[in-house]
Amino acid sequence: MSHSRLLEQLRRSIQIAQFCEQENISTSEGLERREEATHSRRRFLSMAGAAGFALSPMAAFASRKVPGPRIAIIGGGLAGLSCADRLQFKGYSSTIYEASTRLGGRCFSNRTLVPGMACENGGEFIDTSHKMMIAYANEFGLAKESVIKQAGDERFYFAGQHWTEAQVIDELRVVVSNMQGDVRSISGSASFYSKNQSDINLDNTDLATYLDINCAGHPLIRSVLDEAYVSEYGAETSQQSSLNFLSYMRFNKQSKFEPFGTSDERYHLTHGNDGVIEGLEAKLLGPINKGAKLTRLSRNIAGEYLLYFNGSTIPEKADVVIISIPFTVLRGVQVDPLVGFSADKTRAIQTIGYGTNAKTMIAFNSRYWATEFNSNGGALSDLPNVQNIWETNRANATSKAIMTDYGSGNRGAALRTNLLQSQVNAFLNDLNVVFPGIKANATKLGSNYIAHLEHWPSNPLALGSYTSYKPGQFTGIEGLNSEASGLVKFAGEHTDSFYSYQGFMEGACLSGLRAANQVLADIKSGTI
């Protein structure tokens, strides 16, 4: 799964290009076969849906409360809350400490930009394979809207002109054939603990260099892939490992390409994804302390963990600690040597890469892209102020509509909330090239455009959008992020594996579940 609908489409285009080359068929036939596969899968999903989705990961019948250790959870985002939910289900109470005045972290819905609509300041998309997020949505009765089935096409605007998906695939067919040797040579699961020589070599090759070599003579695809991966991981391709790209060139165990991937559906919660946060907050019975920023973590000779908040010299005490804040933020916490982080764990915390994605949501008077251009609002371009865009909350778009501008890499980092109006104006000028006439359709209040910028790179409680491995970090730190340090456990999207759902809301939920299970195992074994 990708962080935007259009990149997911591009990845499927890459898959089709490989499939067409492998089967020696035309691009048009490959596209027809994709349509057939899509319809078959959707029929299956509709039948499966009639039987109902899975129950909550922690169903309503929780165990009775039992005496247990003092459990402190640092961070009240999806990871921390799902961890507390699992522990509560097993009968153990925990105390959550959240630095912000609200819960949710990067799961943060915006219901004020356009009345009656919900856009997402943070995590937006939920795939059919995201079982915990779907189960939570069902448990709390939260409606879902499909964001794949929306009518209309995505747009590719590069080198001063529009390109069709078929044209992009035709170019991709030549390029991906150059990469097959590398795809076959990598293990497919490179990590600190398991890697081959190709993993090491390609991990230490930045993606920009890799694309320069393998896309030589194909400037369209070089630009498309560059913009797509800057958007997907939030960092310039010169700051990304080439394994970010190669790991998605999917092969099964027989090295036969799976041309149509594993999912063609994704959702957004119609009235805002942080409905899951609200549901969990209402469900949890243990203390939740907001406005509590961890500033120091220590340990005494009795083995108790000492947690200092907001610069206080008087600690809270715990027997076990789950840290679910981003490593970018943890770097600013004084962690005393007595806590016992290993050198490898410390290196992972201090060096892991994060993207600089920032989201600007802009209100429009209508779905101009749909009515005038038969587009679903998705576009990828090499224009200075339009990278990756999509329509948000289509289900609630009546007299108004919302478009999300996904600023990434250097552009995302450079955006500023105090320059919102000039930035939106520059965006609309470029968007007017992709969808001529659209600038006049943007909604204004007086002389100002109605828009909101959520700038995660400068948010002191995030300091980045989500995990983005730098060159060398698959073989250098993948697998270390989730490792416990004694009775200090770690959760958060960054601690879920790259090969699972790192960078997604589902990854945060899964990491919370894992951390809780680590605590439960320690209780069972008598370690705590």
Predicted regions and their residues:
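N-terminal export signals
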Residues: 36-64
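C-terminal segments that line or cap access tunnels to active or ligand-binding sites in enzymes
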Residues: 4, 318, 327-463
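Active-site/ligand-binding neighborhood in enzyme catalytic cores
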Residues: 23-28, 38, 193-296, 300-303, ...
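Dinucleotide-binding Rossmann-like beta1-alpha1 core, especially the glycine-rich loop
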Residues: 114-185
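Glycine-rich FAD pyrophosphate-binding loop
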Residues: 88-110
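Core beta-strand elements of the Rossmann-like FAD/NAD(P) dinucleotide-binding domain
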Residues: 312-320
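N-terminal secretory signal peptides
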Residues: 1-39
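N-terminal Rossmann-like FAD-binding beta1-loop-alpha1 element of flavoenzymes
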Residues: 69-95
